[in-house]
UniProtKB/Swiss-Prot annotation:
InterPro entries per UniProt: Glyco_hydro_13_N, Glyco_hydro_b, Glycoside_hydrolase_SF, Ig-like_fold, Ig_E-set, Pullul_strch, Pullul_strch_C, Pullulanase_N2
Effects seen without this gene: No effect on the starch level in leaves and slight increase of water-soluble polysaccharides. No alteration of the amylase-to-amylopectin ratio. ISA3 is able to fully compensate for the loss of PU1.
Positions of the catalytic residues: 552, 589
Miscellaneous field: Double mutant shows that PU1 and ISA3 have redundant function for starch degradation. The involvement of PU1 in amylopectin synthesis is inferred from the phenotype of double mutant in PU1 and ISA2.
Transit peptide: 1-62
GO MF, one example: limit dextrinase activity
EC code: 3.2.1.142
Organism annotation: Arabidopsis thaliana
Function per UniProt: Involved in starch degradation and also probably in the trimming of pre-amylopectin chains during starch synthesis.
Biological process, per Gene Ontology: starch biosynthetic process; starch catabolic process
Residues flagged as site, Transition state stabilizer: 721
Protein known as: Pullulanase 1, chloroplastic
């Protein structure tokens, strides 16, 4: 039966079966649409409804258009049955239990298996199976251990699996469970999700990947659902025909083979014969090794490489652990976030062949390296590199890149649309991407190397780490274990889903891959995913000697995975492993959303769950309160430093009383963050009440504070995501203020992070007014919009309207700002901002009082003044008092200063504040600020007699009391 419909048709279906069925029809309508997976359904050319046989159907349609015909077809019983198997709504959770959300009633449930993936349906029933067994429905709930592992199916029914089955063999088949009513008619059928039973039967801690011995090479692949595995060995990376094909032997889900020493330096791929639920077929998949340690260009083949080979080690590599920058405590860390290509792509002081790659960090005389050295000399400790593993969307071979002639862009108007149009035209074929689209986690990205094939990327990555360590910087890698770039049996960048389909990727209750991260969410609640992540981290620590990890969307990873990884890394010893694991710091994005929210798939690594672990998470509270709004709100929403109440912009923020409350609330959030966002820290709120940090609430009643230890808080106001610090300030502040004022606000924001307890985090370019021409998401905006200029001649403001895709809705706000020449800083502004930023680092590292190690130390020493209902809006007064004769109960940790007072004046006018609690002290301007190039901060005054402070507009001033003063 076929009907012609239009996209605006209204369709009502009336069936002779249960009135509950139309709801199922509607769901199937959406799932069968042509664009089911990655985009919303805005128009549909055809769809199918799955109906039981012999069902009478009436379709009532109305339409406003006679164009764009659509067809409606009623499928055959067999196609209806096969469509059921598209879904995997049942879970084989243990050897003895299958969980399914179905009520059998008086009917029955059967389990089917077909090694050839030949299950079908005819009038005689289900055909094509090798095994058919009856499952017994059990009363009561699922076992407690099953609910703990799979909390999202806690209400499912339990079906008992007979004990005499060869489950190790059955999991290699197409599997289905089917319900029949009391008269034997098919009610429902579905495929199965297998991770539970795979974990129970096949969890494995032995060798995986390639292992080298004097006798040869051994390969090991975990693939318990595969029917056959062989390895294709290639002499050269571009060879189309293998020089050898070796079948692998299986032992309890692990496939292995032994090869000759001559295999070393060759390339290989696995050939895997496996049932794939996405196609419902037995597929032959060609896949890289999940434990690959080397690759050919674009990851076409895995490189058989021994990372312990002396040929791959730069001079002095084995002794690098002895030359690591000193790190007394994690509380001494400060982090600078940088993209490898941004660092040098436009730096003419770097050799042309090294620009945009690993080796640029070895160019000691380049502008970029000299800039990093300035930061290190002022105190910076850690360099966070955006993804450097093998990721998709950038060709490893530079000769394939497309580029734009920038000379054609340089003369365009600051608000021109032409630059973004030209960049967008080639953005998927150029050399730029942030890299949050992982293909293989354990190998350096080839496009950053001089030669992407063979050992070059390994050697050059090691040289980069070594050079940065010698500069004084610890190296942090941005790791993306929460999702994969590709899935399915045939995508060239799919790996894990080819080897054990349906295991590595988290699936929803219908059996489809979860995409809340963006695409292809991974499932670290499954043992071998957890293991792969832990093994990969150890690979980077031991083989590349990196000093820390930042976890992208860490909340989508289970807490146990991160905690166990931290423990495994911490156990590494310099004497036995060549690295000191105790100095390696872990932190990440503890956002709590998607299917994992509120521990939906187990206890996840979210902000609130990580308290007490020593693992850091980004504090978005201090960011939003400082700047205003959020990355998801209106870009003109103002905050503490951008003019809320005190210098409003054109956005409607509500009444004056509303703005006063908003500003007071923002101050509470910031002060909590400055105390390392500790949940038990006591402070006085805007109402004059003594409250804990966990009792300070956000607009949705979520507690602001979540940390138990200072090092669990990463304070920041900017990162690679969203607008740069200078850009967001330029959006939120009133149009009429001067660029001088915006520069002071930029510095004020940095100071609030640099002088807070916890770990400060800065985006590369914060210190030189970096602009992306107001681009809010520059992940694929090319070198043009992401430009960093370490010559300090330009901050990249006004290089055209930012790319349309992510920014067009804001163009009406952006255009007048780019048009106005007064918004663009001069080189003198950039240099002054850099000097002021270096001063902040020098101040932070001038006293351990800015870097307190424990929650108790912060509670004892850190106080906030100018609080309560009578406080002066727009200013924060913080004191940090060390132990001395006046407070003998507090130990002395600073031999130089007994008291530090920091005043953050975000007001557009001078701030005067008398503090009786700070009378009769010997406070003076911090020596760094006495010598500062900023003449304005030198106008700050303290009067000992009254305890009064006077600080200029939009200025952060640090007063110190010397012990010998």
């Amino acid at each position: 039966m076929a009907l012609t419909l239009t996209p605006t048709s209204s369709v009502h279906l009336l069936s002779s079966i249960s009135v509950a069925r139309p709801r199922i029809f509607a769901a199937d309508f959406n799932l069968r649409s042509r664009w089911r997976r990655r985009r919303p359904v805005t128009s549909i050319s055809n769809f199918r409804l799955r109906l039981p046989s012999k069902t009478s159907l009436h379709c009532l349609c109305s339409s406003s258009s006679a164009s764009s015909p659509m067809s409606l077809e009623v499928s055959s019983p067999n196609s209806q049955f096969l469509d059921c198997l598209i879904y995997s709504r049942a879970y084989w959770v243990t050897q003895g239990v299958i969980a399914w959300n179905v009520d059998v009633g008086e009917g029955s449930c059967y389990f089917y298996a077909s090694k050839s993936a030949g299950l079908s349906f005819s009038e005689d029933g289900i055909d094509g199976y090798d095994l058919r067994i009856k499952l017994e429905a059990e009363s009561g709930s699922l076992p407690a251990d099953v609910i703990e592992k799979f909390p999202h199916i806690r209400n499912y029914k339990s079906f008992k699996v007979p004990k005499d089955l060869d489950i190790r063999d059955l999991v290699k088949s197409q599997l289905a469970v089917v319900c029949f009513d009391a008269e034997g008619r098919l009610i429902q059928g579905t495929g199965l999700q297998l991770p539970g039973v795979l974990d129970e039967l096949f969890s494995y801690d032995g060798p995986l990947g390639a292992h080298f011995t004097p006798e040869g090479v051994s390969l090991h692949l975990w693939a318990p659902t595969a029917q056959a595995v062989s390895v294709c060995i290639y002499k050269n990376p571009l060879d189309k025909s293998p020089m050898e094909i070796c079948p692998l032997k299986e032992a309890n889900g692990v496939w292995s083979t032994e090869g000759a020493c001559s295999w070393g330096g060759c390339y290989y791929v696995y050939k895997v014969s496996v049932y794939h639920p996405s196609t419902m077929k037995l597929e032959t998949c060609y896949a890289n090794d999940p434990y690959a340690r080397g690759l050919s260009a674009d990851g076409r083949k895995t490189f058989l490489v021994n990372l312990d080979s002396d040929d791959l080690k730069p001079e002095g590599w084995d002794n690098l652990a002895d030359k690591k920058p000193c790190l007394r405590s994690f509380s001494d860390i400060s982090i600078y976030e940088l993209h490898v290509r941004d660092f040098s792509a436009n730096d003419e002081t770097v050799e042309p062949e090294n620009r945009g790659g690993y080796l640029a960090f070895t160019s000691k005389d380049s502008a970029g390296v000299k800039h990093l050295q300035k930061l290190v000399d002022a105190g910076l400790t850690h360099l966070h590199l955006l993804p450097t593993f093998q990721f998709g969307d950038v060709d490893d071979e530079k000769e394939n890149w497309k580029s734009v002639d920038t000379s054609l862009l340089e003369g365009l108007r600051p608000d021109s649309t032409e630059a973004q149009a030209r960049i967008t035209e080639i953005q998927n074929d150029d050399g730029y991407n942030w890299g949050y689209n992982p293909v293989l986690w354990g190998v350096p990205k080839g496009s950053y190397a001089s030669d992407p094939t063979g050992p070059c990327r390994i050697i050059e990555f090691r040289k980069m780490v070594q050079a940065l360590n010698c500069t004084g910087l610890n190296v942090v890698l941005d790791v993306v274990y929460n999702h994969l770039h590709a899935s399915g049996p045939h995508d060239k960048e799919s790996v894990l889903d080819k080897i054990v389909p349906g295991y590595y990727l988290r699936r929803n209750s219908d059996g489809f891959i979860e995409n809340s991260t963006c695409v292809n969410n991974t499932a670290s609640e499954h043992y071998m995913v957890d293991r792969l992540i832990r093994d990969d981290l150890l690979n980077w620590v031991v083989n590349y000697k990196v000093d820390g990890f930042r976890f992208d969307l860490m909340g989508h990873i289970m807490k146990a995975t991160i905690v166990n990884a931290k423990s495994a890394i911490g156990s590494l010893r310099k004497e036995t492993d060549g690295v000191d694991g105790s100095r390696i710091y872990l932190y990440g994005e503890g956002w709590n959303f998607g299917e994992v929210a509120e521990n939906g798939r187990g206890i996840n690594a979210s902000q609130f769950n990580l308290g007490g672990t020593g693992i850091g998470s980004f504090n978005d509270r201090i960011r939003d309160a400082t700047l205003g709004g959020s990355p998801f709100g209106h870009p003109l929403q103002q905050g503490f430093i951008t003019g809320l109440l005190l210098q409003p912009n054109a956005h409607d923020h509500g009444s004056e009383a509303t703005q006063e409350l908003m500003l007071s609330t923002a101050k509470n959030h910031i002060q909590t963050g400055m105390a390392a966002n500790l949940k038990d820290y006591m402070l006085t709120n805007h109402e004059g009440k003594e409250v804990k940090g966990s009792e300070v609430l956000m607009h949705d009643a979520t507690p602001v504070a979540y940390a138990s230890l200072p090092t669990e808080t990463i304070n920041y106001v900017s990162a690679h995501d969203n607008e740069t610090l200078f850009d967001i300030i330029s959006l939120k502040t009133p149009m009429e203020i001067s660029v001088d004022e915006r520069c002071r606000i930029n510095h004020l924001a940095s100071s609030m992070i640099a002088l807070s307890q916890g770990i400060p985090f800065f985006h590369a370019g914060d210190e030189i007014l970096r602009s992306k021409s107001l681009d809010r998401d520059s992940y694929n905006s090319g070198d043009w919009f992401n430009r960093l200029d370490f010559s300090y001649s330009s901050n990249n403001w006004g290089v055209g309207l930012p790319p349309k895709g992510k920014n067009e809705h804001n163009w009406p706000l952006i255009k007048p700002r780019l048009q106005d020449p007064s918004f663009k800083p001069k080189s003198s502004h950039i240099v002054a901002t850099l000097h002021n930023f270096l001063d902040l680092l020098r101040i932070r590292y001038s006293s351990p009082l800015f870097r307190l190690d424990t929650a108790r130390a912060i509670q004892e020493r850190v106080r906030f003044h100018n609080t309560g209902p009578s406080s002066i809006p727009g200013a924060i007064v913080m004191s940090i008092e060390d132990g001395h004769r006046g407070i003998p109960s507090v130990s002395q940790i600073d031999p130089i200063y007994s008291l530090i007072v920091v005043i953050f004046n975000a007001r557009p006018s001078e701030f005067s504040y008398p503090s009786p609690a700070l009378k009769d002290r010997k406070l003076e301007l911090h020596p760094v600020q006495v010598m500062s190039a900023d003449e304005i901060v030198k106008k700050s005054v303290y009067d000992s007699f009254s305890g009064g402070f006077t600080v200029p507009a939009r200025t952060t001033t640090v007063f110190v009391e010397s012990r010998n003063g």
